[in-house]
């Protein structure tokens, strides 16, 4: 049985991680931390977990207790894992970080986007970017895994086949992405209030979103060179979901794009390439660790449109983190993650 610790268990990614781990036959949550809710029972805060974690309480972070776990997940704001990850690694504990702390390979680039110095630059060289569809073999040997963000997951999975094959003009890619409000976190913010977010949609961070360098980094690796990416995120009046509409110029009209995508993801348990002409919906992935993709070439022209949808809290966060844990410990990748999406 894998002994699990969770740092920061009161946010949406934390409770989603608890929900998924409750269904995992080879993992047990030993420690969950929250400074603000120390002493509160998990099941009292989240009644949906009653019967699964009735005796588990939030506690103040303690490196000794966390270090006794086999793996510790960080479901925290950026900057928190910087301070604790090194001590846990020294204790022999593996770390899976759901925050942005170790996603970017360049400490200075991270500092520019997050407005503070990187707190653990010495760990960046060994941090493995936890996108299993790209880095599965590296994940198996990792001590420190950086779980990709939600927008980066949907965008990279949608564009990687075109870039790996050298088909797309990498200098002019567009990612037009929509997110549910849970992507903004559980903290109280005016923009997340029902009366502000309901019955409305808006673009934000058009000048530059923190996920932009992460997406660009992954696409550069896929293409083997520089990329030019325009990324525009939008907030939509739904709780869960990412819908990415991706545009790429592909001059070669003889390529069977459907076959290309199907071949690339044929052995991927959590990527579903839908039949030609499909339009994947966010509701089709709600609660599931899956990315559904459809590829189109409108009017047979040079512009290819890829539609990519995920649940931002599952394949875009906690589910992908659990997928990484399964790989890391040599388990079936699908363990605890094979349930169907929720409909309606």
UniProtKB/Swiss-Prot annotation:
Catalytic activity: N-acetyl-L-glutamate 5-semialdehyde + phosphate + NADP(+) = N-acetyl-L-glutamyl 5-phosphate + NADPH + H(+)
Keywords in alphabetical order: Amino-acid biosynthesis, Arginine biosynthesis, Cytoplasm, NADP, Oxidoreductase
Highest taxon above the source species: Bacteria
Enzyme class: oxidoreductase
CC annotations in GO: cytoplasm
GO molecular function, one term: NAD binding
Keyword Amino-acid biosynthesis: yes
Active site: 150
InterPro entries xrefs: AGPR_AS, AGPR_type-1, NAD(P)-bd_dom_sf, NAGSA_dehydrogenase, Semialdehyde_DH_NAD-bd
Subcellular location field: Cytoplasm
Listed pathway(s): Amino-acid biosynthesis; L-arginine biosynthesis; N(2)-acetyl-L-ornithine from L-glutamate: step 3/4
EC number: 1.2.1.38
GO biological process, one term: L-arginine biosynthetic process
Stored PANTHER family: N-ACETYL-GAMMA-GLUTAMYL-PHOSPHATE REDUCTASE, CHLOROPLASTIC-RELATED (PTHR32338:SF10), N-ACETYL-GAMMA-GLUTAMYL-PHOSPHATE REDUCTASE, CHLOROPLASTIC-RELATED-RELATED (PTHR32338)
Function as written in the Swiss-Prot or TrEMBL entry: Catalyzes the NADPH-dependent reduction of N-acetyl-5-glutamyl phosphate to yield N-acetyl-L-glutamate 5-semialdehyde.
Family, as annotated: Belongs to the NAGSA dehydrogenase family. Type 1 subfamily.
Full protein name: N-acetyl-gamma-glutamyl-phosphate reductase
């Amino acid at each position: 049985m894998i002994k699990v610790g969770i740092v920061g268990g009161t946010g949406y990614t934390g409770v989603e991680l608890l929900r998924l781990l409750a269904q995992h036959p080879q993992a047990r949550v030993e420690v969950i931390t929250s400074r603000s809710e120390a002493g509160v029972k998990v099941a009292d805060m989240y009644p949906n977990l009653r019967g699964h974690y009735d005796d588990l309480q939030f506690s103040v972070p303690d490196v000794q207790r966390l270090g006794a776990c086999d793996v510790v997940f960080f479901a925290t704001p950026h900057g928190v894992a910087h301070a604790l990850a090194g001590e846990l690694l020294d204790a022999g504990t593996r770390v899976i970080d759901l925050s942005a702390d170790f996603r970017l390979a360049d400490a200075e680039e991270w500092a520019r986007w997050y407005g503070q110095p990187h707190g653990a630059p010495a760990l960046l060289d060994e941090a493995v970017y936890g996108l299993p569809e790209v880095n599965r073999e590296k994940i198996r040997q990792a001590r420190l895994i950086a779980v990709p963000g939600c927008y980066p997951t949907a965008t990279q999975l949608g564009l990687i086949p075109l870039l790996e094959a050298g088909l797309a003009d990498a200098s002019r890619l567009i990612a037009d992405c929509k997110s549910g409000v849970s992507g903004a976190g559980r903290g109280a913010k005016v923009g997340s209030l029902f009366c502000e977010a309901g019955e409305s949609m808006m673009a934000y961070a058009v000048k530059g979103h923190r996920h932009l360098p992460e997406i660009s980094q992954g696409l550069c690796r896929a293409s083997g060179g520089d990329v030019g990416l325009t990324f525009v995120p939008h907030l939509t009046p739904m709780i869960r979901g990412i819908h990415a509409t991706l545009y790429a110029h592909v001059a070669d009209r003889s390529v069977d794009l459907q076959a290309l995508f199907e071949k690339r993801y044929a052995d991927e348990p959590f990527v579903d390439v839908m039949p030609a002409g499909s339009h994947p919906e966010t509701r089709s992935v709600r609660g599931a660790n899956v990315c559904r993709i459809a590829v189109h070439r409108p009017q047979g022209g040079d512009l290819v449109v890829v539609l990519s949808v995920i649940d931002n809290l599952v394949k875009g966060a906690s589910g992908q983190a659990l997928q990484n844990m399964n790989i890391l410990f040599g388990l079936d990748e699908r363990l605890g993650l094979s349930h169907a999406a929720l409909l309606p």
